[in-house]
Amino acid sequence: VSSKYKIKLKTVSVLLLLLAAPLIADKTASAERTTYEERNGSSNNNGNSNSNDSSNSNDSSNSNDSSNSNDSSNSNDSLNSNDSSNSNSNSNSNGSANRMPNMLRSTNSHGTDASYSTAGFIDLDNPFFKSIGTNGRSCASCHIPSQGWTITAKGVQELFEKTEGLDPLFRPVDGANNPESPHPDQLTLEERREVYSMLLNKGNIRVGIGIPADAEFELADVDDPYGFASETELSLFRRPMPSANFKFLSTVMWDGRETTQDPTSTDCIVGTTNCFSPVSKDLATQSNHATLGHAEALHDLSEEEQKAIVDFESGLFSAQILDNEAGELTAEKASGGPRALLEQNYYFGINDTLVGDYQTGAAFNPNVMSLYDSWYRYKPTKSSTSIEIARAAVARGQTLFNTKPINITGVRGLNDDLDVEVLPGTCTTCHNTPNSGNHSTPMPLDIGISDASRRTPDMPLYTLRNKTTGEEIQTTDPGRALITGKWKDIGRFKGPILRSVASRPPYFHDGSAADLPAVVDFYNNRFNIGLTKKEKADLVAFLATL
């Protein structure tokens, strides 16, 4: 080849390298963000990062889900909606891919869930998504968008197979059944499966809490299949709480250990001196404790980092938006999906069961759920479509949730505190926050989830003895009692926010209910409700749309 052509080829090569340099630099700069998205499948089970393409997704197995011409025109949450914020879903003004789209959708066994942020996008540059500790974890390790902002057993199993159990989620500190287990890279694959079985099978994180020195009870006996628990540190296997819909939060953590009292606060339980700090303050403290504990950080989060995490969480809303059978959950003036939650009224003590509404003074209204009032018009006939039949079932389920009589008995925190053997109620007696489903004030209850009679062989069992009376109780988790030291608080836990519940099986604080039908069966058996097969199906249909 002549020297003249060599010079030309060299010149072209240099020009190509100069043109490629910005692309290479941008790709390198986004490596950390890409790692998160790859780990979690871009938080979109369809692999579709452009929300404008979501109308073509295979989220629903029912071919009629999008066939109703009225469905998309009635809602801001429509699957065909071109949210203005979505134009920035894959890049910021500098073109770096540090965002996920607003109205981020992910599939579950019942349909499709959507996440909406008041920021206009899911910001992957937030400290929530950053590894700040020493073990590679971030908040998002246990609070994954595609898993209802928590983790599911199925999701954990998929991650285990993908990484052979070496992902930062699988760390001895709280992922292993015994925190003294070797680091996963020192174990065989099958040994990892055994060591992390509670995380794999139930999506449970191990929480270690000791019995307070001044507690009214002591540990009389412990049966721990993993050989670790003692009075100094009980092993408590619990589901991570979702990190969305915090607008409606009244209690932080299952046992309320991050909910603090503040005598100067105006958020007080009526008739008591129990006043509580702003939830935002408690969440900031919780974010720091989680970083020091779960992420094994060597130093506290800065105040700026804590605020950024809390601001992100507080602006995040998540709810089911599409049902496999009923179609779009905003159709025909229904109020499903996350955006309606922004306008939903909430304050401390709203619609309180025991004393009525704290602000208006109105009596407790058991019709807590009203999302699908407009679907009461559906009366199935032989000519009804499958979607109409499904929507009628959802509406019936909502009515059952609001009004089906339940004779509430043996619930610590309710029957004993009120000194009534039988309290006539409904599901909404305990799930009283309008269209959210948690309790609007701190009110931990013991409905029997951690009773010894429900213990499975994979759970530790603790025998607690009252120091004064000698009475003994067996439980798999003392719950609130490990925070207060009070005998009466054994087995008490908060009721969770119910929105986006279809995205996050298994259920209850210990993951003991595999699916929504199992949840309904528990309550039906526990309180002898007498639900028919059709009523059970209707309740499940409703819960799946929340």
At which residue positions do the language-model features occur?
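Periplasmic c-type cytochrome electron-transfer domains
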Residues: 32, 37-40, 95-546
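N-terminal secretory signal peptides that target proteins for export/translocation
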Residues: 1-8
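Boundary at the C-terminal end of the N-terminal hydrophobic targeting segment
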Residues: 25, 30-31
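Asparagine/serine/threonine-enriched low-complexity, disordered tracts
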Residues: 4, 40-98
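Bacterial N-terminal signal peptides
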Residues: 12-22
